[in-house]
């Protein structure tokens, strides 16, 4: 049997529907915890414990005195001046690549309700402007197999700039898999962020110990330590003023319906061309 369980935000409705979770809104630390994430209210059944953010990983050694691209126009200039040095991964094999593709498609087209449960054909038609961007840059950018592949190529000097998860980058640096000189930033045009949540199983054999552990997990000191060691975004309201370099995500990942559609269209419109 399970005591404390970690979930993605997308898994929460299923767990709640199955009545598999116990209420945690009376934990001592609940007031300072984050319980609304990615437009989802956990309704007292879970708390966020791990925040993550996509952005760009880069190699300062290779970048030299070049300015980091902050706008899509600046990114285009960088790509034009440094062909094949910008890479992004297949969206079917890593969220960082999908995050970048979503931003291109969204900014080149019109805004829409990406959380909608059904896909509007008019929205998908507007994505053509985004696919045209990829077609125009086909010979100047590198498509990698996965997020890990992107960071390996960045580490080896093949790439200078690539979309990445911040916690993925920091985690690989901690294990020595990639060089500690590599850095991360979120460009001004925005990249989506998210996080994971923790809850207590309704049939937990150790409910008191589970509550003690979960309350410890959301404390400011614990969240700060997780951030320092693993690169996660702290999930505690007391720590929010300190997050100038990792802003609260204002850009959200697409919901399930549009994410699935985007990946299908990417294969047809970009990979098969």
Where are these regions (language model features)?
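Loop/turn elements at helix/coil->beta-strand transitions in domains of secreted/extracellular proteins
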Residues: 1-3, 82-86, 139-140, 157-160, ...
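Extracytoplasmic ligand-binding site segments that recognize negatively charged/polar headgroups
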Residues: 2-142, 148-149
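A ligand-binding cleft/hinge motif common to bilobed small-molecule-binding domains
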Residues: 12-14, 161-179
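Hydrophobic residues within well-ordered alpha-helices
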Residues: 15, 153-155, 200
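Periplasmic-binding protein-like
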Residues: 33, 52, 131-135, 166-167, ...
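Alpha-helical segments flanking ligand/cofactor-binding loops in enzyme cores
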Residues: 151-152, 211
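Mature extracytoplasmic/periplasmic domains
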Residues: 191-192, 196-256
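Conserved C-terminal helix/tail region of periplasmic/extracytoplasmic solute-binding proteins
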Residues: 252-273
């Amino acid at each position: 049997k399970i005591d404390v369980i970690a979930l993605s935000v997308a898994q929460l409705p299923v767990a709640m529907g199955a009545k598999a979770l116990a209420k945690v809104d009376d934990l001592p630390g609940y007031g300072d915890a984050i319980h609304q994430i990615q437009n989802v209210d956990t309704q007292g059944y879970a708390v966020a414990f791990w925040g993550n953010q996509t952005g760009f990983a880069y190699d300062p050694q290779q970048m030299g005195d070049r300015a980091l691209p902050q706008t899509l126009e600046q990114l285009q200039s960088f790509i034009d001046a440094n062909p094949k040095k910008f890479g992004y991964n297949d969206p079917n094999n890593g969220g960082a690549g999908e995050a970048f593709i979503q931003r291109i498609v969204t900014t080149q087209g019109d805004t829409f309700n990406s959380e909608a449960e059904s896909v509007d054909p008019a929205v998908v038609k507007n994505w053509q402007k985004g696919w045209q961007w990829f077609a125009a840059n086909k010979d100047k950018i590198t498509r990698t197999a996965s997020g890990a592949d992107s960071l390996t190529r960045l580490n080896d000097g093949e790439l200078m700039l690539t979309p990445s998860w911040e916690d993925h980058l920091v985690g690989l640096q901690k294990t020595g898999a990639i060089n500690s000189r590599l850095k991360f930033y979120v460009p001004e045009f925005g990249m989506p962020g998210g996080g994971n949540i923790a809850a207590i199983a309704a049939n937990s054999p150790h409910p008191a110990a589970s509550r003690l552990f979960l309350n410890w997990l959301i404390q400011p000191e614990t969240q700060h330590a997780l951030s320092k060691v693993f690169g996660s975004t702290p999930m505690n309201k007391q720590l929010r003023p300190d997050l100038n370099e990792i802003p609260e995500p204002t850009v959200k990942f697409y919901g399930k319906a549009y994410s699935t559609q985007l990946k299908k269209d990417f294969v047809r419109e970009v990979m098969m061309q």
